[in-house]
A protein has these predicted regions:
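Sequence-level detector for tyrosine residue identity
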Residues: 27, 42, 74, 78, ...
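Soluble extramembrane domains flanking the early transmembrane region of eukaryotic membrane proteins
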Residues: 4-233
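Generic detector of multi-pass transmembrane helix bundles and their immediately adjacent loops
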Residues: 297-496
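Hydrophobic alpha-helical transmembrane segments corresponding to the first two to three helices
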Residues: 209-351
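Residue-level marker of positions within ordered structural domains that often coincide
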Residues: 63, 201, 259, 330, ...
Length: 496
């Protein structure tokens, strides 16, 4: 009872945390970033895959720097924006900077010598203007406008080189600066993934010479008829289809449980709840992404429902694998001491890490805690490795030729393959596929999850066809018969 109360309190706290952060999560394409007293040299503002006629609207409503007006910083081009064009979202950029401007003549992809095309927007505080400089053929004719508009069509129609803007106004209001520009991808050659940075190049980070900045910037990314990045456009349909698949699987599993209701155990109902919550999570996610694509902003109610569903789904899925691996309800009814310790440590960590992953995924790239995303991913992998321990212990505790040992080994391979495909292969696929096909990583993850659910349902279906349940019972009965027989023979011999 105490454990149930603690679990309920823990889940209530996590749901409260989700509701608090739901409003700050900004997985949308009309969004903004506000940083204060930040001394990072490069602040990532966004990454987006643009198709032809796509636009990126940048509205800097407030910028200030913590140096005196007479400082040399106001006579140098130390601050500004940098727009990079890359092949795909997963490209790692090597920032090779110079001491003078923080912007080198060439910025390279990690591990390559290919110079990336870029546009720099350097602030000139003396002239109150922004100097626009282009580097690379891919952005040579990129249309940049200073006209305020909806982000869809308020751009010049003439794309001749001589009409390309080279300066933009920089508004000064008592030391607080503001600016606006609109980037328009007019041709097929300009399609691709773009990354936007803010540059703070006044002295090395953390030194006396460095300057902290306050920055508020609003961004609107838009493709024709859609606010989603090119690789995200098919995602709503993908998750609607996944919803139908998981719902069908849940109905099928419910029918199996009803048919063999005399042999059903509690773990079977937990498995059903996992599939149901997976279906709900896919549905809420699909609706949320659909509204983002249509309106540019997520509907808060669908976002919160998605966070709650994915939290319950992840927690129940994790617990299910732990219980199946330990054999609870099948080959034993009580956890061992080391299994209790493992459960008490890993499950809360996994729940908190799931929350962290959701918050990081929904946060702005430029927010400080976004940089901790890799730690959350590593913790997730650690938790999945940890849940293999009960499986290994169960395998070692079985007889060499027992059917249960064979089934444990199969389950072990299933989990290893699932973790490898959804944590490693999905990551590699997302960071290596062309920007139009980034949705393939989501497809692979959903297919892998669906296959695992089917295999788990088949392997651990209710008796009398479940070897996992059937064999240990026979083994226990045999042992009991041997004990009774030996005891009876011994008693008879002693009486004689």
């Amino acid at each position: 009872i105490m454990m149930n109360r603690r679990s309920s309190n823990f889940m209530a706290i996590t749901l409260f945390i989700i509701s608090i952060f739901a409003e700050s999560c900004v997985y949308s394409k009309i969004h903004g970033l506000k940083v204060e007293q930040d001394d990072r040299k490069y602040i990532a503002l966004g990454t987006f895959g643009f198709l032809k006629e796509g636009t990126w609207e940048v509205n800097m409503t407030k910028f200030s720097v913590t140096v005196k007006p007479s400082s040399e910083v106001y006579r140098k081009n130390y601050f500004g924006f940098m727009l990079l064009k890359i092949a795909r979202s997963g490209v790692i950029v090597d920032m090779e900077t110079s001491a003078e401007t923080c912007i080198s003549d060439g910025i390279y992809m990690s591990g390559h010598h290919e110079v990336l095309s870029m546009v720099t927007f350097r602030f000139d505080f003396q002239e109150n203007m922004i100097h626009v400089e282009r580097s690379g053929k891919a952005v040579k004719n990129l249309i940049i406008s200073n006209r305020y508009g909806s982000g869809k069509s308020e751009v010049p129609k003439n794309t001749e080189t001589e009409d390309v803007i080279t300066t933009l106004p920089l508004q000064n209001n008592n030391g607080f600066y503001s600016a606006y520009f609109l980037v328009h991808m007019m041709s097929d050659a300009e399609e691709g993934v773009y990354k936007l940075y803010f540059l703070n190049c006044h002295g090395p980070k953390g030194t006396v010479e460095s300057s902290s900045i306050d920055l508020t910037v609003n961004l609107v990314e838009h493709n024709v008829g859609n606010f989603l990045s090119a690789g995200e456009i098919p995602i709503p349909l993908l998750y609607f289809v996944s919803t139908a698949v998981y719902l069908a699987a849940a109905l099928l599993w419910a029918a199996v449980l009803h048919r063999y209701k005399n042999d059903v155990m509690k773990i079977h109902y937990v498995m059903l709840s996992v599939v149901v919550f997976t279906s709900l999570a896919c549905f809420f996610h699909a609706v949320n992404i659909y509204y983002i694509g249509k309106e540019g902003l997520h509907e808060e109610v669908w976002a919160v429902l998605y966070y709650i569903a994915i939290l319950f789904q992840g927690t129940l899925f994790f617990i299910t694998i732990l219980l199946l691996g330990a054999g609870i309800g099948f080959i034993k009814h009580v956890l061992s001491c080391r299994e209790k310790i493992l459960f008490a440590i890993v499950i809360p960590i996994q729940v908190l890490d799931s929350i962290a992953l959701v918050l990081v995924e929904e946060s702005e790239e430029g927010q400080l805690y976004y940089e901790w995303s890799m730690i959350a991913v590593l913790v997730d992998v650690f938790c999945w490795i940890a849940i293999l321990c009960p499986l290994v212990w169960s395998i070692r505790s079985r007889k060499q030729d027992s059917s249960t040992k064979k089934l444990f080994r199969q389950f072990y391979l299933m989990i290893v393959c699932y973790v490898y495909l959804t944590r490693v292969v999905v990551f590699l696929l997302k960071n290596s596929t062309p920007f139009r096909y980034e949705w393939l990583s989501d497809l692979l993850k959903e297919i892998t999850t669906a296959v695992l659910f089917v295999l788990m349902g088949y392997k651990f279906r209710p008796a009398p066809y479940n070897l996992y349940l059937q064999v240990p019972q026979e083994s226990d009965d045999t042992k009991m018969d041997e004990v009774i027989t030996k005891t009876g023979v011994t008693d008879a011999m002693e009486s004689e």
